[in-house]
Amino acid sequence: MENDKASHASPSIGVNEFVVQGEISIDDSERSVKSVSVSISDDEDSKTDVQDNMATPSTRSKFQTDLAIDNRLLEKDPKYKKLFTEKRRRRRPESCINLMTKGKGTGQKDNINDQIFSLRILPGSDLNSLKDSLWIIKISTQPDVEKTIARAFSDFYWLYHQLQNNHWGKTIPPPTRSNILVEKDEFAINHLFMIRNNEKYDPIFNFKPEYIISLQLMAMIKHIFNDKVLRLDSNFIDFISWDDDLPESLQIVVDDSTFTGDKILMTSSQFRELKEFHKQSKKVESITNSHASLIPVTELTEIYISPTKLFSRKDYQRLFQPQSTDNTFNNNDPLIQEWIPKSKTLFTSLSFGSSAPTYQEASTEIQACHDWVSISKEQWKQLLYHVLQYIVDEAVKVNSVINEFTECLKQISLDEVIRANSELFLKFSKLNESFLKKFKGASRQDILKLIILFDENVRFCESFESILNQRLKLGKILSIIEVDLDKKKNFLDKLSPGNNNSNNEDLKIRTAEDEYRIVLKRYNRVKQSWEKIMEDILNERKEFEKREAAEVNSCLKSIRDLNMDEKKHYLQLWQDFVPDEHISQ
């Protein structure tokens, strides 16, 4: 593993400390934490998965007592009957949206599905350190109704990995790992333009890093909003600090207009809310055992399979809770070793040891997905670079022609052979200058639309690689359990034929049967997750291919229409210019 991963782990950390310390609280009294993202089954036979990150309340509270309710009291006053019989709901403070919509009748409720959400993300600090930078998120649903919160850049990565833990097989375009679109590498727009423009830098094409990063972050949040499963995730709702229920079908509009680059100062209330969110996110991460904040930002394809989600509650306790007074358990168990830090890191590695069985992907469809995503990722990178080359080359070419023509007109006007003609040439040069300015602005938007779309697809491929790694990891764990299951079955078969009906032999058989039954349930549970994630991966690929075709066509159509409008505008300037000159003469 890389050095930046190693920095997160202590060299002396034990396996029992790694799995048990702070990762999950078994005490029922400690479970009632807001926005718990994982529900661990209380029953060994239960196979319920995590659904929408709702915490499973304990069947009996520690301080619960049996209190008899006097029926006469209930009949005496309806208020008491309502208090003791109806389910109590948690009361949330009324948000600004509730205050605006309160008292408007049922007609407002009928239009909730047609609500349009506007999203805007602005820098809240300097980008000296991208990981520690602050960003202001503005979400508005109606005029004068706006929710403004502050989040650190690392919080977007926390959200990305937390949602990955909550929803195996779901792709989410991650935040940018660095200023990849503004650095001097093969994707550098500014550097590319400088080369095409004979090293002359034009400030109009100055793509500020904070602007490009804000577009990338907005693309990520927009994707989550558009996913009917992800947007209802309680961790995402906590991330955007939304108090009301999100509509089932909403429209999200991204405000991609340029900004001056001045940072927006946080208010004291936003700062307090940010600190509270960080505390809450740590609790959620500890309970769900997701390691969302521990995975390095440079590893977008790195994954961590939470054992608290994979196994049932009793099975998790059986595997990872210490069974002796020395606070240790069997470190040599191949299944336990899958969660032991490798190379002094806290992350499960896909480089498997020789003692564990080797997992080979049996599904031809998943193998095809591996080949497809590697080719698709490289193609999107190349397409991004070539499209940038073409757009920048064309922009520089037209820019140069118009500049030369304008300078020529200015030079002719300075000769003043005929004063009327000189004024005409001067006006015409100003006309071309105004058109050139609009042309540069339009070209800039063309570039931004394409690079954000293509870059989002590149990052989608990286997210797709991560869910393929989830499938690999689950397959590896399934192979280990399958070997253990065969051993338990063979041992049970050896005991059964030689049974002489003695008490000792009966005890051995019952013990072997219990162990076999436990491992069989574990195998079926993991296999169910392993098979389900394959269906999710195939569906994600189909959805992406359908979505990318529609988005690329829409983007190119928008650019084509914009260019047509610019040409019409330029012709209109010509048509208006000639009659005006005739009138002035």
UniProtKB/Swiss-Prot annotation:
Q: Which Pfam families match?
A: PX (PF00787), Vps5 (PF09325)
- Gene3D superfamilies, alphabetized: Arfaptin homology (AH) domain/BAR domain, Phox-like domain
**Single biological process term from Gene Ontology:** regulation of TORC1 signaling
The terms under GO molecular function for this entry are: phosphatidylinositol binding; phosphatidylinositol-3-phosphate binding; phosphatidylserine binding
Q: Annotated region Disordered: where?
A: 27-59
Taxonomically, which superkingdom? Eukaryota
Q: Which GO terms describe its cellular component?
A: cytoplasm; cytosol; endosome; vacuolar membrane
Q: Which PANTHER family match?
A: FI18122P1 (PTHR10555:SF170), SORTING NEXIN (PTHR10555)
Remarks, miscellaneous: Present with 1270 molecules/cell in log phase SD medium.
Q: What is this protein called?
A: Uncharacterized protein YKR078W
Species for this entry: Saccharomyces cerevisiae (strain ATCC 204508 / S288c)
Q: What is the phylogenetic placement of the source species in the record? A: Eukaryota, Fungi, Dikarya, Ascomycota, Saccharomycotina
